[in-house]
């Protein structure tokens, strides 16, 4: 959600900090700020509401200069978006930036006010600044003051602290919110995402839960929760240099929609061998665990939850294994029964989703045989804390509304289904080879769906004045309808809901009139006749129908509603295929509405707070 960048260098860091914030804009934010400290102990703090560009102009105008600094993009949780609530926050000579939520901030605020501290903002972060300032009065160092302060905090935090009296040092602390140290030569860095630091380093170490670190120009010292000096492995970052380049595309989301054929191809690479799923390529020793699985529990949020809902159909139909899918924020707060030989699967693009991480940590104490994650970021907390990981190969996804991460998650889930089905003897060699062939054809089939971009753009004009939309689907196309409704509401701000088509007469039919667009996913399959009956129910009440189907479904001759007739694809991969034209529909509607497609209001790319 929020973004953090910090630097200690022998050169001016103002440009480094601002560049880092620009690289984190995709995560979502409503305000931004920097604090820069020079060797003459002069600290400059500048904060602005709105885009990082406004902050950049202010930094240039104020001639901000110094070798140590911290910067932040804020997504409001406590206190409205305003300059006074933007980070960095200051207490005396202490400046602080923070990601996360301090759950006991109100109690701490009362104590600090009794000590004479005056609060300038309405944020929870300001208590950290005052706590550190208080502890520094008796501590021997900034490191000791931060260590004493953070043990008083309850909740999630990734925080970076700077002291005006110590202009060549930063102290950072992590609990529940990711932080990564970047190593340079005569300079070192800190950020909430390694992408922020790609212009200055490719050597990274990821802090673990409870770590506190002291960063200077020439050294990094890391201490665990017990205060013991520890080392964290330094990784050589292997990131896409051109991920931030939109190229010929107007938006990152559009670029990422069109990247899906190659993203799926990359996700399949190495995972198929001699016409079968290469189980060892899923994860080393995965076969030993997967062969014993008798139940699947999927936990995820948002788009990833919708991917899990599709996979439930596959697990039960292909692998003949029971599967539950839960929203992570619900799963972690209820009493659940763990089935024997049950595998927990978490799904997340970023691997830092707070509720999903919390659910994983709870589940690991609850008797699951193993915890697996399907994730797009190899260095993420979910990957590090799971027993094994099955990585999507979507590449960096910058648009807040997920596209290629969703379709590559589905690709991994289908591969996993086939692997379990074979290991448990529930899938014949011929059946496995047929599914594998369907997956191998999928990238080129999605390319054929992208050809319909102009036709879908024309269709989107009908939605220019609409405030509501319904999406309908049956079977595994119901969660595809759910995902399509989510995309539309995320980026166009149209109120969109999805229903299992058979539920129409149980309530949603009351909403149908001549002003209500109804989008139906209706390829030819065993449920098509049922879907056609639901379409007739909408037609009879004058609803505006938009049907996405294939030639075999027989909608070409229809004159009283609009259709996008797509090429036929194999049934098993059809849910992935139909996702793509529906993504295009949401994208073009958002363009007509004039919204911020890549950074929709109130939303963040990585939801790192609960």
From Swiss-Prot:
It is found in: Cytoplasm. Its EC number is 2.6.1.16. It is an enzyme of class 2 (transferase). SUPFAM superfamilies: N-terminal nucleophile aminohydrolases (Ntn hydrolases), SIS domain. This is Glutamine--fructose-6-phosphate aminotransferase [isomerizing]. The gene is glmS. GO terms for molecular function: carbohydrate derivative binding; glutamine-fructose-6-phosphate transaminase (isomerizing) activity. Gene3D superfamilies: Glucose-6-phosphate isomerase like protein, domain 1 (3.40.50.10490), Glutamine Phosphoribosylpyrophosphate, subunit 1, domain 1 (3.60.20.10).
């Amino acid at each position: 959600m929020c973004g953090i960048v910090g630097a200690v260098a022998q050169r001016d860091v103002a440009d480094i900090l601002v560049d880092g914030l620009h690289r984190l804009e995709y995560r979502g934010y409503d305000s931004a700020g920097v604090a820069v400290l020079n060797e003459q102990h002069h600290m400059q703090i500048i904060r602005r509401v709105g885009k990082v560009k406004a902050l950049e102009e202010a930094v240039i105008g104020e001639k901000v200069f110094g070798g140590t600094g911290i910067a932040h993009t804020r997504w409001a949780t406590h206190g409205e978006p305003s300059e006074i609530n933007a980070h960095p926050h200051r207490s005396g000579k202490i400046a602080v930036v923070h990601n996360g939520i301090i759950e006991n901030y109100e109690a701490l605020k009362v104590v600090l006010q009794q000590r004479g501290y005056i609060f300038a903002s309405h944020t929870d972060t300001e208590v950290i600044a005052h706590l550190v300032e208080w502890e520094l009065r008796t501590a021997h160092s900034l490191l000791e003051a931060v260590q004493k302060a953070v043990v008083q905090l309850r909740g999630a935090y990734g925080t970076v602290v700077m002291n005006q009296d110590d202009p060549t040092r930063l102290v950072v602390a992590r609990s529940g919110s990711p932080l990564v140290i970047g190593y340079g030569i005569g300079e070192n860095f800190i950020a909430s995402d390694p992408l922020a630091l790609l212009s200055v380093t490719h050597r990274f170490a990821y802090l673990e839960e409870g770590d506190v670190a002291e960063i200077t120009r020439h050294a990094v010292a890391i201490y665990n929760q017990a205060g013991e000096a520890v080392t964290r492995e330094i990784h050589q970052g292997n990131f896409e240099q051109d991920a931030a380049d939109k190229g010929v595309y107007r938006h990152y989301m559009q670029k990422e929609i069109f990247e899906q054929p190659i993203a799926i191809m990359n996700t399949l690479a190495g995972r198929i061998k001699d016409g079968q799923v290469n189980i060892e390529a899923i994860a080393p020793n995965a076969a030993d665990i997967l062969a014993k699985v008798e139940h699947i529990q999927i936990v995820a949020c948002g788009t990833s939850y919708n991917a899990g809902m599709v996979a439930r159909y596959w697990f039960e139909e292909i692998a003949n294994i029971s599967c539950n899918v839960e929203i992570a924020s619900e799963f972690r707060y209820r009493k659940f029964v763990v089935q024997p030989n049950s595998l927990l699967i978490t799904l997340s693009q970023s691997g830092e989703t707070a509720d999903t991480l919390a659910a994983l940590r709870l589940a690991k104490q609850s008797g699951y045989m193993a915890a697996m994650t399907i994730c797009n970021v190899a260095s993420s907390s979910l990957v590090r804390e799971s027993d094994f990981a099955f990585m999507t190969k979507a590449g960096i996804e910058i648009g807040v509304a997920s596209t290629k991460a969703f379709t590559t998650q589905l690709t991994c889930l289908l591969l996993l289904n086939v692997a379990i089905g074979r290991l448990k003897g529930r899938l014949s060699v011929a059946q496995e080879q047929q599914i594998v062939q369907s997956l191998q054809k999928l990238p080129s089939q999605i390319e054929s769906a992208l050809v319909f971009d102009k036709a879908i753009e024309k269709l989107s004009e009908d939605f220019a004045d609409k405030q509501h939309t319904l999406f309908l689907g049956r079977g595994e196309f119901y969660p595809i309808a759910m995902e399509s409704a989510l995309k539309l509401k995320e980026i166009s701000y149209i109120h969109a809901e999805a229903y299992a088509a058979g539920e129409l007469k149980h309530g949603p039919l009351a909403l149908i009139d001549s002003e209500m667009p109804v989008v139906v996913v209706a390829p030819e399959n065993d449920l098509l006749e049922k879907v056609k009956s639901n379409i007739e129910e909408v037609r009879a009440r004058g609803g505006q129908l938009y049907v996405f189907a294939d030639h075999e479904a027989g909608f070409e001759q229809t004159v009283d509603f609009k259709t996008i007739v797509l090429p036929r694809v194999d049934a098993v991969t059809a849910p992935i295929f139909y996702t793509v034209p529906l993504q295009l529909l949401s994208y073009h509607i958002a363009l007509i509405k004039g919204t911020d497609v890549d950074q929709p209001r109130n939303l963040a790319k990585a939801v790192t707070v609960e």
